[in-house]
Regions:
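N-terminal nicking endonuclease/strand-transfer module with a His-rich metal-binding environment
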Residues: 1-172
Length: 172
């Protein structure tokens, strides 16, 4: 169906250098407009990269395994078929991220409209914002195939279906 949002977990960073490259890629169309956390604060790619890199090192400090193979953040793409209204798509992504991560994990998101499908690149830091030291864990075994994005339902009446969205939980 062409009226569906696809949300894919596309990877994560295993090094601070990869965090920097990913943030630069996401902000390539507008390096002064990276959306940050629940307020949707607009920050520069430099500031986003610094926060994400600091989070990377914090997540690594709390990681169960002290290896260079564990990813310290998660990358996602929210995409819709065709040129969906950019404001509605950004609002839906913002609402979904706020519901899942607000006050718990830092996240960054940027709109890309350079393909036939508008899409939003997202980076979510694994490092907890509280003092528990629990890193975020995306449980891919518990796919949630029918999560609705409230903003899209109310503003542009799209039903959300996706094949790679996962249940968010804290790892111990």
């Amino acid at each position: 169906n062409t009226n569906h949002v696809v949300i894919k977990v596309t990877g994560g960073a295993k090094s601070a250098a990869v965090v920097k490259r990913k943030m630069e890629y996401d902000a390539r169309d507008n390096p002064e407009e990276v959306h940050f956390n629940e307020a949707g604060e607009i920050i520069s790619v430099e500031k986003a990269t610094q926060i994400a890199t600091d989070d990377f090192h914090l997540a690594k400090a709390f990681a169960k395994n002290d290896t260079d193979t564990e990813k310290m953040n998660y990358n996602m793409v929210f995409s819709m078929h065709s040129k969906t209204d950019e404001k509605a798509l950004m609002g839906a992504v913002s609402d979904t991220l706020r519901e899942s991560f607000a006050g718990k994990y830092n996240y960054f998101y940027s709109l890309h409209n350079d393909t036939k499908n508008n899409h939003v690149h997202v980076t979510v830091s694994k490092a907890s914002l509280d003092s528990t030291g629990k890193n975020l864990h995306l449980d891919k075994t518990k796919l949630n195939k029918h999560t609705r994005i409230t903003k899209l339902q109310s503003e542009i009446n799209y039903c959300v279906m996706h094949n790679h969205f996962v249940k968010f939980s804290n790892s111990v």
